Curated annotation (Swiss-Prot):
Biased composition (Acidic residues): 744-762, 770-789
Cofactor names: Zn(2+)
Organism: Saccharum officinarum (Sugarcane)
Protein's UniProt name: DNA-directed RNA polymerase subunit beta''
Gene Ontology cellular component annotations, sorted alphabetically: chloroplast; DNA-directed RNA polymerase complex; mitochondrion
Classification via HAMAP family: RNApol_bact_RpoC2
Cofactor binding, note field: Binds 1 Zn(2+) ion per subunit.
GO biological process: DNA-templated transcription
Catalytic activity annotation: RNA(n) + a ribonucleoside 5'-triphosphate = RNA(n+1) + diphosphate
Database matches in NCBIfam families: rpoC2_cyan
Known partners and oligomeric status: In plastids the minimal PEP RNA polymerase catalytic core is composed of four subunits: alpha, beta, beta', and beta''. When a (nuclear-encoded) sigma factor is associated with the core the holoenzyme is formed, which can initiate transcription.
Amino acid sequence: MAERANLVFHNKEIDGTAIKRLISRLIDHFGMGYTSHILDQIKTLGFHQATTTSISLGIEDLLTIPSKGWLVQDAEQQSFLLEKHYYYGAVHAVEKLRQSVEIWYATSEYLKQEMNSNFRITDPSNPVYLMSFSGARGNASQVHQLVGMRGLMADPQGQMIDLPIQSNLREGLSLTEYIISCYGARKGVVDTAVRTADAGYLTRRLVEVVQHIIVRRRDCGTIQGISVSPQNGMTEKLFVQTLIGRVLADDIYIGSRCIASRNQDIGIGLVNRFITAFRAQPFRAQPIYIRTPFTCRSTSWICQLCYGRSPTHGDLVELGEAVGIIAGQSIGEPGTQLTLRTFHTGGVFTGGTADLIRSPSNGKIQFNEDLVHPTRTRHGQPAFLCYIDLHVTIQSQDILHSVNIPLKSLILVQNDQYVESEQVIAEIRAGMSTLHFKEKVQKHIYSESDGEMHWSTDVYHAPEYQYGNLRRLPKTSHLWILSVSMCRSSIASFSLHKDQDQMNTYSFSVDGRYIFDFSMANDQVSHRLLDTFGKKDREILDYLTPDRIVSNGHWNCFYPSILQDNSDLLAKKRRNRFVVPLQYHQEQEKERISCLGISMEIPFMGVLRRNTIFAYFDDPRYRKDKRGSGIVKFRYRTLEEEYRTQEEEYRTREEEYRTREEEYRTREEDSEDEYESPENKYRTREGEGEYEILEDEYRTLEDEYETLEDEYGILEDEYRTLEKDSEEEYGSLENKYRTREGEGEYEILEEDSEEEYGSSEDGSEKEYGTLEEDSEEDSEEDSEDEYGSPEENSILKKEGFIEHRGTKEFSLKYQKEVDRFFFILQELHILPRSSSLKVLDNSIIGVDTQLTKNTRSRLGGLVRVKRKKSHTELKIFSGDIHFPEEADKILGGSLIPPEREKKDSKESKKRKNWVYVQRKKILKSKEKYFVSVRPAVAYEMDEGRNLATLFPQDLLQEEDNLQLRLVNFISHENSKLTQRIYHTNSQFVRTCLVVNWEQEEKEGARASLVEVRTNDLIRDFLRIELVKSTISYTRRRYDRTSVGLIPNNRLDRNNTNSFYSKAKIQSLSQHQEVIGTLLNRNKEYPSLMILLASNCSRIGLFKNSKYPNAVKESNPRIPIRDIFGLLGVIVPSISNFSSSYYLLTHNQILLKKYLFLDNLKQTFQVLQGLKYSLIDENKRISNFDSNIMLEPFHLNWHFLHHDSWEETLAIIHLGQFICENLCLFKSHIKKSGQIFIVNMDSFVLRAAKPYLATIGATVHGHYGKILYKGDRLVTFIYEKSRSSDITQGLPKVEQIFEARSIDSLSPNLERRIEDWNERIPRILGVPWGFLIGAELTIAQSRISLVNKIQKVYRSQGVQIHNRHIEIIIRQVTSKVRVSEDGMSNVFLPGELIGLLRAERAGRALDESIYYRAILLGITRASLNTQSFISEASFQETARVLAKAALRGRIDWLKGLKENVVLGGIIPVGTGFQKFVHRSPQDKNLYFEIQKKNLFASEMRDILFLHTELVSSDSDVTNNFYETSETPFTPIYTI
């Protein structure tokens, strides 16, 4: 009893780790037997206490944490701020997601810490606390879910849901929270079911790969080791764990005193000495080299010293111990537990979030400002960075708190600031690993409301989607969604105008989706847009009367996609640019072109690339009929012949034009007589289908035959342009036409050329020489305009077009052109392979015959069926069928011109149309064939009229050496079937104006509409300038920094890019409007908006009954003296208050400048009627049926105070975007929006929502596109940390063991390898460099694999000794593959052999064997052992045994498994003795001899000195060889 009284009584709770320590010390002091008795008493004590306490868990024991309320409130406050920043457009969606996830994660973690202290203080004997924190049941994170908050959840894809579950399970979840939390629960249930089997299988594979590893020797004699040093950022705990139980590979000195010798095993005493030495001299201490299983030089076993101490009892491991199996089981066993752990966050955080330090009380905070450095947090908020550990004091009323902040932390408050209790004052940087694997993730942002899209920066077109509607942002900027409400009502619900206001014509916006709908089945256009001549005084204009389209009101339209068809099926329509059709002049009135024809493409604030198509003209006559598909055929002509025949042709041409008009009218009857076939219902394209629409154009056709020419151009990117300089391809056939070879059934056709049409101009000069009306500068370039320049066409899609390989000199002789092409109707159905056809091959059918169950024919004629592998093609050829008597006289594939009788047919009347003759063989007979005669529609290609009349040629001539040239494109391949696309007209030919420039270094040109203001005149120009040379006078959109004033003489230069330099009379129609259909705005531009003639200013509308379309030019520079305000108030002209007229001024219900001339005022009275209509001074009533109305709640009025009017003038201009909370004048702006109306005392904002988008984000849709709620708006690509725990626990470990690639490579891996390759030769001298480099790489990869596996286990709270993992990794990495380049006599190329075995064979043979190290997975390593019995018992038994038999393999029964299978004694434990026949003397002798080798020791010094680079275990010194094992067990048999 006396003894017991003297003992110290530790009144302290004891947890799992304390018990572990106690047991290990008991074993050290008393040995195993005695310890077990002591532990037995502890067990009895524990059971006794537990029974008397009788702990049970009730719901009352779950105490909620008092601080939870304000913590959650704090987090919500931060989230709310974040939401507001997002709403203002200050942060983008990805930032918002990241920050909100971090806010909630930090809150949840802090709550977890609070929970511990709360239990400890309030109720230390609480059963929940006792169970979870003693480690008996449950862990902190589970208790946290019960009493704290459940926190963030991951969705099934592993993405975080940024809505955290704020309740805990004790309080109960709401419905939403419950559903969110079901994701993780479901995953957990599935994992438990699926992975338990996986875990067992993992153990089996691990044991399989290392079952033969047994401790067989005391020492293998290696001199290598792995360096361990606490300087590498290793924590002390880890350092101790790594060292204890290992054996030193080298002596250790402190100063000159040796404190430990080689081959000594390391105990706790020695480790403590190391630690004190390191602390005393942290920089002078050398790293400690230890032996590991990696460095063991044995092949299929391991020695005692490389393994170290046995973990069970603290001595060196005994000989004959099966350490391999122990290792496999140690790693596999925790796997069964890991399967049951699915963390509630899905483990998305891999240490990226920081720990927070909160203030202990209210008070003033103070710290030394010299020790901190201003910086920003990763979210951009200002903060201070500590250089060293910082001491912070917080002074409250009566007490001084001090807080220590570790180095590299961020302080989030300022010195001397007042902080509240629990306010976050600092953020501790989490130790980020250097190799943090990131993955690229896309995040789509969807529009939150209906609206139209605007952006405030230039955009690039993503190169691979040249014709799509995706754009990449070159810099961070805002996208705006301007609010609209979609309502189709005939009653305008809201107007901003008072009675008698001045306003623009038709300033209500109209949704363009409903306007040009040419795709309707009847050939009427459903919207008459504007009738420009007031026939009667009170004509009512209605938007929706199905009526003829009015052609001579010169109006402009955006987007050809509207003009031709509005079908959403055609995604390839080029919506990527603004297309502005040009207007034309009174002078050119006789050359009347469809006003829909010419369009300019301007990428809005965009960049034109080299050779971009800048404008194009689609002639309406080159449109394919909507009703059918068919084949296009071309002919080429030579120029010489053309000159010869031009005169006669011109005369015949004229007559032909005379008859063309009747032909249009009589085409329908004609076609019936002409082709007696059911096909006549399908009018050919030249029929009235199209001309009905454009009736107005052709009403005056008789007077205009000379100019009804064709121009042509590109359509979709699939098609190929023809080569113009095609002499290489087609030779110079002078009198022949050839079409290209078709699809096999068309032969090449030849025919005479008498009936060829030439150009309709009188002189050949006009076509091929200079143009008379052209401006002078242009003439020398013009020949190039016709025929293209060398790199004309490179913008088109790579595979689709043939490049022009033109030369600079154009020789007339060989220049060929396609002079006409033919469209032959033919129907094609591509049917699934399985479909059953209701018609036979080669049968003749009528229109609307049923082909398959649900398709019917649209043409009648001959049916041809081709069965392909994947589908069936069914073609229907329309036309007559003849059976000729004489076989020889008909050439197959001919095109027969009109006016010629066909010899073999019985018809005698003359044809008016071309026909296409095809020979078809009758099946099973060689001679017999029939001829199908198919109608062909001929389209003439006349190059005669240059586009000079369409595209003014002096356009952009001077500026920056831009060149424009004409390129003509045919849109379809020769003889290629064009598919019918529903409700569309295919354009066959398109003429394009291509922009190019000479400077090679300039990649792109910037096209924009510039508004130039001098004094009070506003002019708009189209500016194309090379990038990098922005001219200062251009006022960028909504950019108020650059003032748009330029000297007057800039405008007076003659070569200003005026659109019509010759126009002395500016022809203005009575209503000259721009109607931006798809862009939801109509505006009226009194002057030509694109390029204004240099001598005209902006002129208002003229009401002049005599000259409705002409204005005599008075003094063009009328100063604009006064401005009418919105209510007709005259405002003195203020120079910096002017409306900006861009091409796209948004919803032009804006202040307007008027000239002060009596007859220029245009006033509208607003009728207060049920149906909204407007009456102007001429008493014309206009009705609206507006599809997008502005509703009152989308507009916000802001009233300015008179005193602040002066300053705000500089700030506000129309169209400017304003973010919410901007302080313009005394009050804040309450909502984001765009300035829409400016009054004297107020302005109106149109509500808008800004979205911040970063560089490289992809914008979906074009400028001004109408978006509906939920449409995809923008896609971000961002990097996020690869979540290391979605594949958490077991699967992750398994992936590493199986050597599957799980991570992307480290971003800086390449640089590291380069550095390494530079340093190695420098350190070791050149000759050894790469040999050692390769060895060290293997060593380094082994170490990093071990670290990876340990990281996963540690993250799950499982402790496994490194040695076990090392043994497995050694097996996985110890194989090499013999490579082909050094053919050795010993091994086959591609064979897998052990690394040491390869080295030995190399030494024995004195020849080098080339091999490369490979990483085998554990399964493959199990199937590549030296024992085929072991392999066969693992997998693929029959295959393994058969292979072994064929090779004659011998199994030496080294491992355990082989012996178990055959029933022998296993060679471990006592059975091990029979393998050992060696005396210890030999071994010692061997080492003494080897140590005398001087070279070896020098080499070792080199290696050990420099292994800080990477921990090395290189085996360079080939002088060492290992004596083979006992004579009766040869290991290798080849």
